[in-house]
């Protein structure tokens, strides 16, 4: 059996983007994170798993309460670096959406996905 812990469609407001105006005014980001554990959760013990609240706290710290960056790729990497510190995590999948990304004309959804696996 494989155990995956997730946080889906967590919407936050933050100031990140390639253009100066994006780093000055908050805009929505929608983050989904899935982490696969190294082994099954055999005990009814929160210490033997990944607390999904920790995923939300990681987003808050790395996306909302951090210095502005230009790329969603950088934000995904920051989340992976943080979550992968948990030795129980074998792999991580992150999807980040930017609903109000500045496209040349209406339509589309800006999305970045990153995956990480422990060596």
Q: What do the PLM-derived regions correspond to, one by one?
A:
Residues 1-119:
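N-terminal, polar/charged subdomain of small-to-medium soluble alpha/beta proteins
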């Amino acid at each position: 059996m494989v155990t995956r812990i997730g946080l889906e469609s967590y919407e936050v407001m933050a100031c990140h983007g390639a253009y100066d105006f994006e780093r000055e005014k908050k805009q929505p980001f929608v983050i989904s994170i899935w982490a696969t554990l190294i082994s099954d959760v055999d005990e009814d013990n929160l210490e033997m798993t990944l607390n999904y609240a920790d995923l939300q706290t990681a987003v808050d710290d790395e996306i909302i309460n951090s210095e502005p960056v230009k790329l969603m790729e950088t934000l995904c990497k920051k989340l992976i670096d943080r979550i992968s510190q948990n030795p129980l995590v074998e792999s991580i999948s992150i999807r980040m959406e930017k609903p109000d990304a500045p496209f040349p004309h209406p339509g589309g959804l800006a999305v970045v996905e990153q995956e990480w696996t422990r060596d």
